Amino acid sequence: MNTKIGLSLSEKYYWSWKTKTSNCPCFSCSGEGNIVINKVSGEKYLQYNLTYLKDIWAPLKELNLEKQFDIIALVRGGGLTGQTESIQLGVARLLCQMNPQNRSVLKPFGFLTRDARIKERKKYGLRKARKAPQYSKR
């Protein structure tokens, strides 16, 4: 029994993924449909934002598996939106790991696609990444 996350090694699935600047190892096991993020309930961690919760459950709803699995995620870095996207991607990859036939159902909805956009760095001489100081001709 892995006491750190409360799962035995024989009944859990694991996948780790990154989105933007957030990193999210996800674990899944059979259960009643609970979400635990960083050892806190998912609703409380995501500040009771229903949009974030729907995004996490979307891959499971497409496969009609909402009440069959518990999701445990350990998220680091980024904001709540980036963390939610990385959890969603981790859940979708877990479902493909459990059953490779799920890939054909999840792929058209974009659940298996990583959003590769990241923040552009600030360049010297500029105020932000691309914002230049005002130009004066004379």
From Swiss-Prot:
SUPFAM superfamilies: Ribosomal protein S5 domain 2-like. This is Small ribosomal subunit protein uS9c. GO terms for molecular function: RNA binding; structural constituent of ribosome. Keywords: Chloroplast, Plastid, Ribonucleoprotein, Ribosomal protein. Pfam families: Ribosomal_S9. The keyword Membrane does not apply. GO terms for cellular component: chloroplast; small ribosomal subunit. GO terms for biological process: translation. HAMAP family: Ribosomal_uS9_B (MF_00532_B). Signal peptide: none annotated. It is found in: Plastid, Chloroplast. InterPro entries: Ribosomal_Su5_D2-typ_SF, Ribosomal_uS9, Ribosomal_uS9_bac/plastid, Ribosomal_uS9_CS, Ribsml_uS5_D2-typ_fold_subgr. Belongs to the universal ribosomal protein uS9 family.
